[in-house]
Swiss-Prot record:
Protein name listed in UniProt: Phosphoglucosamine mutase
Cofactor(s) recorded in Swiss-Prot or TrEMBL: Mg(2+)
UniProt PTM comment: Activated by phosphorylation.
Coiled coil spans: none
InterPro entries: A-D-PHexomutase_a/b/a-I, A-D-PHexomutase_a/b/a-I/II/III, A-D-PHexomutase_a/b/a-II, A-D-PHexomutase_a/b/a-III, A-D-PHexomutase_C, A-D-PHexomutase_C_sf, A-D-PHexomutase_CS, Alpha-D-phosphohexomutase_SF
Gene transcribed to yield this protein: glmM
Protein's organism: Marinobacter nauticus (strain ATCC 700491 / DSM 11845 / VT8) (Marinobacter aquaeolei)
Biological processes, Gene Ontology terms: carbohydrate metabolic process; peptidoglycan biosynthetic process; UDP-N-acetylglucosamine biosynthetic process
Residues at the active site: 103 (phosphoserine intermediate)
HAMAP family assigned to the protein according to its UniProt record, in alphabetical order: GlmM_B
Record keywords: Isomerase, Magnesium, Metal-binding, Phosphoprotein
Superkingdom classification of source: Bacteria
Gene Ontology molecular function terms on file: magnesium ion binding; phosphoglucosamine mutase activity; phosphomannomutase activity
Residue sites binding Mg(2+) per the record: 103, 242, 244, 246
Length: 447
């Protein structure tokens, strides 16, 4: 495959004002995408949605202009969760959906992500075609062929109804008090409606976006405010989304954090008990070994994908399985959505809790997270640690010392000059010793 110049594993992302996250580039990207979609024989319309970053207005206008110059009609959704844009792209029968967001990053970052007409990630060939057109100068189509732009005023309502449709009609949240943390992000105006309309008493924090406060000490990457609110309100559960709404983490009534690994186990184990799992479960290289061991105990197959929801989806599709996820709170539930969806994932977990007749704490007790420790070793330049004989030998010795109940992972960061050294096992002391020894070997082996 040709090396991509702009697209990473999850679109294009960077700091606002630094190439390629500039209005000039976004204008060109809109035009290039329009050319690629038209030549792929796709429908002549594209949806654009964004999160609540101030820079989103600027990039929305630039993309709109570029697409119109290519002769493509544009529908503007305004601030909407990333999975909502995937869903609406399908229901509007659009050529593609474009998301302007940098997910859980601070406001000074932004990015672009594309969805296909089916609401899935664009295939590699189409991304390569967009990059090919980015190398060409913009040529505006004939005046009578220019694209038109319009706003979709009922986008939030459409998505709220979709979220509710993913649970049975008889399911309600009556008698439940929830605290929602919307990260001052894209879920701020839809998530409260979903849970209130299903009968919950809802307290909301992180729902006053000002363009600069997205993810700032709130949301799934900063659970402190949610813990405090759950305690103060004596709520049953806290639910935290990230800035673009494709992740979810929870806080139990006792203030304990419920991460993506535990949510994945709760969902998978309850579906297995109901006979609705339909296969195994996909995690990632970073998924806690406790998940794998607990699922094995109840007869559920488990497979690890590379880190990233795109790779989780690839393995789910390859196996024709339904459920996968990451510790960060990205969960893919294929019989509900085409991509990770924080609100839908939260509803599915709450459905599992209600159906089980147990508390969240009782369901979590089915798995024990093993002690895990990671050290990031900074290197002059990234290299494959498994290509060094001294590192491989040290890793083999460490694995032998941990036995079957332990796991070691060495991998290069995809974005920074770091080698990540991670280990899991039964003993925290043993894990710490093993990771520190391996990190020292990696440091000495650095070129």
């Amino acid at each position: 495959m040709t090396q991509r110049k702009y697209f990473g594993t999850d679109g294009i992302r960077g700091r606002v004002g630094d190439s390629p996250i500039t209005p000039e580039f976004m204008l060109h990207l809109g035009w290039a995408a329009g050319q690629a979609f038209k030549r792929a024989g796709q429908r002549n319309s594209v949806l654009i949605g964004k999160d609540t970053r101030l820079s989103g207005y600027m990039f929305e206008s630039a993309l709109e202009a570029g697409l119109a110059a290519a002769g493509v009609d544009v529908k503007l959704l305004g601030p909407m969760p990333t999975p909502a844009i995937a869903y609406l792209t399908r229901t509007f029968r659009a050529s593609a959906g474009i998301v302007i967001s940098a997910s859980h990053n601070p406001h000074h970052d932004n990015g672009i992500k594309f969805f296909s007409s089916a609401g899935t990630k664009l295939d590699d060939a189409l991304e390569a075609e967009i990059e090919r057109w980015l190398d060409q100068p913009i040529e505006v189509c004939e005046p009578e062929e220019l694209g038109k732009a319009s706003r979709v005023d009922d986008a939030p309502g459409r998505y709220v109804e979709f979220c509710k449709s993913t649970v049975p009609n008889e399911f309600t949240l009556d008698g439940m008090h929830l605290v929602l943390d919307c990260a001052h992000g894209a879920t701020y105006h839809v998530a409260p409606k979903v849970f209130r309309e299903l009968g919950a008493k809802v307290t909301v924090i992180g729902a006053e976006p000002d363009g600069l406060n997205i993810n700032l000490n709130v949301g799934s990457t900063h659970l402190g405010a949610l813990k405090q609110a759950v305690a103060e309100k004596k709520a049953d559960l806290g639910i935290a989304f990230d800035g673009d709404g494709d992740r979810v983490l929870m806080v139990d009534r006792d203030g304990s954090e419920v991460d993506g690994d535990e949510l994945l186990y709760i969902l998978a184990s309850q579906r297995q008990a109901e006979g609705r799992l339909n296969g195994g479960v996909v995690g990632t290289l970073m998924t806690n070994l406790g998940v794998e061991l607990a699922l094995r105990e109840i007869g559920v197959e488990f497979e690890r994908a590379k880190v990233g929801d795109r790779y989780v989806m690839e393995r789910l599709l390859a196996n024709n399985w339904l459920i996968g996820g990451e510790g960060s709170g990205h969960m893919v539930i294929r019989d509900c959505t085409t991509t990770g969806d924080g609100i839908v994932s939260a509803l599915q977990v709450l459905l599992a809790v209600r159906k089980s007749g147990k508390t969240m704490g009782e369901l979590r007790a089915g798995m024990s997270k093993l002690p895990q420790k990671m050290i990031n070793v900074r290197v002059a330049e990234r290299f494959d640690p498994l290509g060094r004989a001294d590192i491989v030998e040290a890793m083999a010795r460490a694995e032998a010392s941990l036995g079957d109940a332990g796991r070691i992972l060495l991998r290069a960061s995809g974005t920074e000059p770091l080698i990540r050294v991670m280990a899991e096992g039964q003993s925290a002391d043993d894990i710490t010793r093993v990771v520190e020894e391996l990190a020292l070997v990696v440091e000495r082996s650095t070129p």
